[in-house]
Amino acid sequence: METVAVKANKPAEYKRPFLSPLNQRRWQNFKANRRGYWSLWVFLTLFVLSLFAEFLANDRPILVWFKGSIHAPVIFDYPEELWLGEDGFLPVTDYKITEIEQAFSQHGWALWPPVRYSYRTVNNELPEPAPSAPSWLYSKEQRCQAYTLGVDDPGCNLGNWNWLGTDDQARDVLARAIYGFRISVLFGLILTLLSAVIGVTAGAGQGYFGGWTDLLFQRFIEIWSSLPVLYILLIIAAILPPGFWILLGIMLLFTWVGFVGVVRAEFLRARNFEYVNAARALGVGNRAIIYRHLLPNAMVATLTFLPFILNGSITTLTSLDFLGLGLPPGSASLGELLAQGKNNLQAPWLGITVFVVLSMMLSLLIFVGEAVRDAFDPRKTFG
C-alpha cells in the first residue's frame, strides 16, 4: 500500500516539448496563414509523389505475375527470354511490343503505372507526325490507325494514351512534366541548402570577427559578385560536358553570396550584446558562441529567404535549359519543353503544360515564403 501511495504522489516527469514556446508561437503564426499552410502541404505532396515518378510514369510494369512467380520490372531488368522463351533475344525487355503484352495476358497479369511512358520513351504509334495532340482529341479510328491491326489491335487501348500529347520527338508530355518537376525541385533544394550552408558560414565569420577579416571578405565578395555569370556558364559549357552536378557546382559558385549580407549584418549587430560578452567572460570559445548563441538568432532572417531562393533556383534552371545551357539533351527538363513550345506554336499543349506546372510550383513556393515571413515577424510573434 505504501508503494502505491508513493507512486501516486510522485510528480510526473517533465517532458521537454518538441518546439520551444517561441517556435510554437511561430508555428501557430504560420498555420494562421491558411494560404501558405495549405500551399506547403500541396507542394510537399506533389514533391513526394514526384520522388516516385518511376511508379507513376514508366514504360515498364510495376509488377508482373507470370507463370506462378512475381517480378518487378520497374526495378530490375529482365531478358525477353523470360517471357517469350526461345523467341526472345533482347537482353532487356521492351514491354511495349505486342508479343510481351499477349504473354502477360495468357500466363499472368501486369500492373502498369498510370502513365505507360517514361520521359524518354518514343511513341511510334502516333496518329500524326510529332508533336501530336492529346489522345482524347482524336477519334478511335485516328488513334488506332498507326497500329498493325487498327482498332482491333490490343495495344490501342486507354493505357497507351498520351493524355497531354507528345513533344516534337514523340515523347509523352505528361511523363516529361512529372520527371521535369522532380529534377527542378531537387536541383533547387540542393542548390539552396548548399548555398545557405556556405553563405551563412561566410557571413557568420565576417560579422563575428570583423576588422580585417570582414574587410577582406567584403572586397572579395564585391569582386566575385561582379563576375558575368552567363558568360562564365557559356565558357564552362563549351569545355565541360553538360550534367546535373556540373551545373549545380557552377551555380553554387555564385548563389551563396546572397546569404552573406543578411547573416553578416545580424552578427555585426549582436556580437557585442551582453549575453555574448557574458559567454566570453565565462570562457566560452568562439565556435560555441557563434553556433549556440548567435547563429540561431541570425537564422531567423535567413529562413525567411529560403523559399524565395528556392524559387529563384528553379527559375534559373528552367531559363538555362530554355537557352540550351542547362541539363544534357534528352533530360526531363521543363525549360527544354518550354523551348519546344516556342519552336512549335502549332502545338499549344507544350507551352500550356509547362506554364501550368511552373506557375503552380512557383506560386506555391511564394505563398509558403509569405507565410514563413509572417511567422518570423516579431510584431506578430511578440505582439
Task: Give the ranges of each region predicted by the language model.
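Alpha-helical transmembrane segments of integral membrane proteins
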Residues: 166-383
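Gly/Trp-centered helix-boundary motif
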Residues: 1-196, 200, 330, 341-356, ...
